Amino acid sequence: MLQALLDSKDFLALTLAHPEQFDGEFSFNLGDHTQVEVWDTGVIVFEPIQNEGKDIVLSCGVHGNETAPIELCNSLIKQLLQQKIIAKQRTLFLIGNPLAINNGTRIIDENMNRLFSGEHSNPPGLVNPERVRAKKLEAYVDRFFTAAADGRQRIHYDLHTAMRASKHEKFAIYPYRPGRAFSGEQIMFLAASGVDTVLFHHEPTTTFSYFSSERYGADAFTIELGKVYPMGQNDMTRFIATHEMFMRLITAKPLELDAFDADKVNLYQVCRVINKHFDDFEFTFATDVENFRSFPKGFVLAREGGQEIKVEHEFESVVFPNAKVPIGNRTVICLIPAVNADVR
């Protein structure tokens, strides 16, 4: 495996050729500047001999059909392996769900991005590939962050694409972080990366980004980089700014960020999450409605169990509507413009 990676510089191809696991860990050096460690299929660490004080996790492919972030990360990995760019920050890349990527599907058995913060081991336990992999991914993040000295900035960008069109093509979800202000610098970094819209979440979740934020104090985000397309059919020119800023971050080049300015970004706060309680749950709007579509107060969003679910605020925007989830799962997130968000 080591020789195959050294020859091809294509970590994604190696991962997809061995989607369940590698035959053990291996490591090698790039020149006299970087140690590379491969911990598992889809798990590769770049450890600069001299680093600048940030620990960065870039994860992709938690959902197997969300291919643009996978191609973006593989491009960065390839450039690092080819020594076209040199890491100056400790960086962990995670290709989340190789089995689903090979299958060309979002999941194999279960939505992995609902299985973190230990949810993978709650009943029914480690009964499917997503649950097993989520537990491993948590362990790799823990190993990576705890191997470095305390006091360093920890960053985790969990990269996705959405199943539907969006009023805001690229947007990020800022996990709930009670007692900690939101980072204006991080929001402006995202804006410079082409991600000009941020949603402030209002409660704990079992997503990958919340896990890193809550457990390790990381500046963590779930980042949606556009719409789902098959592998090889993404217009990668739409990700030039994202690639450039991630490259600058990894190589410790000047980020040249603007000071935080709420007028330069779109800021929303989650006002509620609507979960499914009955099999007859259905939305009143079209199934192909775009993310961030806004509805006025009193509008009937959905019906279930003989009850109507109405818009409660003057206007609410919806993201990730999906009526076909299991009972107990989230059907939609409702948003209002952010008011008095603690951004510093």
Swiss-Prot record:
Q: How is the cofactor bound?
A: Binds 1 zinc ion per subunit.
State whether keyword Ribosomal protein applies.
no
The active site annotation covers E224
Give the Pfam families listed for this entry. Answer: AstE_AspA_cat (PF24827), AstE_AspA_hybrid (PF04952)
Q: NCBIfam families, alphabetically?
A: arg_catab_astE, PRK05324.1
Q: Which family does it belong to?
A: Belongs to the AspA/AstE family. Succinylglutamate desuccinylase subfamily.
* Name under which the protein is recorded: Succinylglutamate desuccinylase
- Organism this protein belongs to: Shewanella putrefaciens (strain CN-32 / ATCC BAA-453)
